Amino acid sequence: METELCLAAGYIETFAGNGKARSTGDGKRAVKAGIPLPHHAALDREEQWFYFAESGSDRIRRVHLQEGTVHNFAGIGETCYSGDDGVCGEAGLYLPLGVAFDSRNNLYICDSGSNRIRKVDHETGIITTVVGTGQHGFNGDGPAREVNLTWPAAIAFGTDDVLYIADTQAHKVRRYDPKTDLVTTIAGTWTAEDDAREQPLVARNLVVLSGDAIGIDFSDDQGWLMPVCSDGLDMSMYLDDGKPAMDARLYDIVGIAVDSKDDVYVVDKGSNRVRKIDVQTGVISTVAGVCRYGYDGDDKPAVRAMLHAPEAAIFDRDGHLYISDTMNHRVRKVDGKTGMITTVAGNGDSGYEDKNIGGCGAARFVAKESAGQLKHGDGLLGIEAVVNSPVGLAMDSQGHLYICERGENKIRRLKLS
């Protein structure tokens, strides 16, 4: 068995990918295959196959967990939309980013560039569009195939096969109910004024805050002080905890997860936070991050810890939340009981120091063992290894965390304690 698991708790290995940015190796060992820009991932219900969106080739590929071989599943390797009502392996995908399984083992694909959510029937392999017209720009709620999506980036299922969609460039979270075939909005508002506020402000009269809270305050045209990040971006529109989620500004939501209570968590890369939408009350709150980007350590409440452009989140069966802290090159864990944040993978380095080698290219220093062998970090503790720009996360029933390492074109596997 190629992928027989022998990792000790806390250690990391390469599960798939040779680090090269060209899609290769169908039918061969996954660790020898090229998997350009793996994004989000999921395991099927039987945990026979591991599926991932290979955004660099516009395909969905899968790894057989027992044999360790990789195979194409959906997409033809061309950036296009085509093939509805046909076999998924002959359909065109346009920047697929998200994948998720419903209770019947049907695979749903977030076909971002075509502004659609597509479904592959488990029994027949036929692909269809279930949400989206193909047009972008918010046009309200209603029947699923009459509703526009705008570059959706992630999907996740709740109970009763209700699908939650990160409608990224519409700055909204959408809810698709397959029983009624209706799409509704559960979070997010955005206006033309909000677009203007994404630009750095110019200081006229300013007051420097004491300490290192958010940054500095700029006076707007009405004389109000606005909390601003150190890079000049207006953060005032994000200070909406405790308010209805429908009134919240969601800047760049690129990840989504659902907990055991059916509450929805969105990863807002643009505000460097993970937000929680309480489905009973409709109220939004922050569970990790402080708006400002950076890294200021672990072992503190997650709501006081800095994140840097996080892109994904997932829950384990004990209710702990794992976050891809992408530009901090770490995977973080938020304890479900205490709310404290720690790192489970990644030492914070983006991946080694590049050196010129006399006009012949560049060499990468990885890591050196006492025996003089170079390593990427496999076989090390997860917190000692380099994890370069982690994005999508998946979890199996044995407590293994799968990490799509976009910066290295690999998928890593970590044995959780």
Can you annotate each of these PLM segments?
Residues 64-68, 121-125, 177-181, 278-282, ...:
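Short loop/turn segments that connect beta-strands within beta-propeller blades
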Residues 55, 112, 168, 269, ...:
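Short loop/turn segments immediately following the C-termini of beta-strands
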Residues 34, 39-42, 97-100, 153-156, ...:
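Conserved beta-strand position repeated across blades of beta-propeller domains
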Residues 2-37, 68-95, 126-151, 181-252, ...:
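Gly/Pro-rich loop segments of beta-rich domains
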Residues 49-51, 106-108, 162-164, 263-265, ...:
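Conserved beta-propeller blade signature
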Residues 43-47, 101-104, 157-160, 258-261, ...:
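Residue-level detector of Asp-centered blade-edge/turn motifs that repeat once per structural unit
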Residues 58-61, 115-117, 171-173, 272-274, ...:
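Structural signal for beta-propeller blades
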Residues 388-417:
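Blade-level signature of beta-propeller repeat domains, shared across WD40, Kelch, NHL, RCC1
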